[in-house]
Amino acid sequence: MKSLSAWLLALALVVSPLGAGLWFNQAYLGWLNESIPDANAYAAAWQETVDGQQQLRHPAVIHWLPSACLCRLLTLPHAVQISAEAAENGFNIYQFNGADRGLGEIRSVLLEPVLGASPTILITDTSGQVRYVGAYSDGIRCASGDSLVTSFIADPQALPSHRVVGLNVQTCRCLSP
């Protein structure tokens, strides 16, 4: 009887992490563009949100990592790293509705439902135009290798002249944080 209990315990210890991993994969890991049907409306809504924040100084890196989003925990180290690099390169650093150390000044904003996929990073140029909005990077921790974000924060003067919407990535995302 003792042997059967030990085997059942061992089986439970093996199956539980597999089940948790499957649940996480189904609930949080996926293609960001599947969650946002209209990239143009998504980008326009973010631009409208930025325009409504008159106190923001540009160029800026803006983080949105809602506290209710499990992916926030995985993305946070990369977001802090991006903030430090961007600040060194002349960007102002902000976070919307957050309170994380290392992510810049906190701004409380009312976000539209269309902005429901997170984590999200925005990069604005000197005139306040959003030049990048989307994922930090691809991968489960939003931090796999160099990304567009890394190249964009290297120099505020070298941002693209058009808006880039970074949704074509498989990453950890929360749909309704």
Protein language model regions, located:
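Hydrophobic membrane-insertion alpha-helices, especially the h-region
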Residues: K2-A27
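Short, basic/aromatic recognition patches
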Residues: L103-V114
